[in-house]
Amino acid sequence: MALNGFGRRVSASVLLIALSLLSGALILPPAAAQRDENYPPPGILKMAKPFHDACVEKTGVTEAAIKEFSDGEIHEDEKLKCYMNCFFHEIEVVDDNGDVHLEKLFATVPLSMRDKLMEMSKGCVHPEGDTLCHKAWWFHQCWKKADPKHYFLP
């Protein structure tokens, strides 16, 4: 049976859609970050503010860079990476090798968030990077990729 022009276009379109789905070429947008008056939890943001302020001052990172990483896209910024490292050191959850002690980190968050953080951390155990700042960034980008909806950077 010969297909007319319209039939060929429809068949070709269906074939392209099927191939896209099968090959993974159809990219779905990442989950949008959850942001409202209750998330990120105001109590955590209040607790984190002194550490945040100290690390902004020490590293010179911009609030815009922090917000973009937290709410937008993963990006590389040396000052941001060092802010992340500073924050880990300020809350005393990282050792001198740049390894985050997850049990200490879990203890710093309320029970209501602990399960999310534990789930987010499953594949984020062995940091890569040549410096402490790069290792800190590795953890954060790993967590953000694992759960972009709930990840936030205070």
From Swiss-Prot:
Subcellular location: Secreted
A Pfam family matched in the record: PBP_GOBP
Disulfide bond annotation, renumbered to this chain: 55-86, 82-133, 124-142
Source domain of life: Eukaryota
CC per GO annotation: extracellular region; extracellular space
Xref: InterPro entries: PBP/GOBP, PBP_GOBP_sf
Tissues in which the protein is found: In the ventrolateral region of the antenna, expressed in two distinct types of olfactory hairs: in most sensilla trichodea and in a subset of the small sensilla basiconica (at protein level).
SMART domains per record: PhBP
The protein, known as: General odorant-binding protein 83a
Origin organism lineage: Eukaryota, Metazoa, Ecdysozoa, Arthropoda, Hexapoda
